[in-house]
């Protein structure tokens, strides 16, 4: 009997947001959603609506964050960590980014809708 090795399948989501940033294609994006300077060593994807509370892993619900700030928030409500000024500074960084796999203006508009919905609750 011949036994074939099974190759594991990765279900890791590859967000164009983080991927393009890591490639250096977003030089205007220097700060995470909660502030802090982004580096290749500390960048992480933040779920605006926590994954543990039903938040989807999609661009409409993801932001770049400094890992330490992301971990501090955990699954606590976004309004405990994000001020209006912080959010406006974050999305402003994306408004002139137009890449084949990423439209910064569209991203900023969709993320704004997500944050506004969560703040109404």
Summary of predicted features, one role per range:
Residues 1-13, 17-19:
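Non-Sec secretion/translocation targeting segments of pathogen effectors
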Residues 2-5, 25, 111:
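Generic short amphipathic/hydrophobic targeting helices enriched at N-termini
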Residues 14-23, 45-52:
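Short Cys/His-rich Zn2+-coordinating modules
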Residues 20-43, 66:
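Short cysteine-rich loop/turn motifs with clustered Cys
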Residues 35-64, 73, 78:
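Histidine-centered nuclease catalytic patch
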Residues 60-61, 68-121:
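A detector for short metal-coordination/catalytic motifs
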């Amino acid at each position: 009997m011949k036994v074939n090795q099974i190759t594991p399948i990765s279900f890791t989501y590859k967000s164009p947001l983080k991927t393009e940033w890591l490639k250096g294609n977003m030089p205007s994006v220097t700060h995470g959603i909660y502030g802090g300077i982004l580096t290749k060593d500390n960048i992480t994807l933040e779920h605006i609506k926590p994954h543990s509370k039903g938040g989807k892993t999609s661009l409409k619900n993801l932001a770049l964050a400094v890992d330490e700030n992301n971990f501090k928030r955990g699954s606590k409500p976004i309004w405990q960590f994000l001020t209006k000024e912080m959010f406006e500074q974050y999305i402003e960084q994306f408004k002139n980014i137009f890449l084949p796999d990423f439209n910064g203006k569209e991203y900023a508009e969709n993320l704004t809708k997500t944050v506004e919905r969560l703040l109404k609750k």
